[in-house]
Amino acid sequence: MYYFITFRTYGTWLHGDERGSVDRAHNQVGTELLAPDANLERYRRQLMKSPPVHLDGERRACVESTLREVATHRGWAIHALNVLSNHVHVVVETDETPENAKPEKALNDFKAWATRRLRESGSLSNAAEVWEHHGSTRYLKTEEAVASACHYVLNCQDE
């Protein structure tokens, strides 16, 4: 199975953000994003348990090497990977069949091991929240979908 997985660092893109955001009512392709709302963003910021996490060059390299290590250990193939300052995109091929597909396993493994390695490096404290809850896990069911996701990950990212 091929998946397009995205996950964000903690506190860097809250509901209400001027860029728009996704929630349960605004999470389908083609639907409007959650509208910017300064009051909602301020409220979400007040609920934060730790400061926002930004990935500098050293942290980005740590996350990238860790995701590649996890994929190798699991027997997965990474087809595209981009670690940015506030989120991670990865197109990964697992050994799952459609009947037992669980993209959340890949998402959770990537986040857990990246967190562990960042903490081991001394880059983040043990108390810091590192990633936002969950993330995006999209099934890629055709070669065209895989190619499109890889193109997006590798060629369509701004810092």
PLM regions with names:
Residues 1-159:
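Short catalytic/metal-binding and nucleic-acid-binding patches
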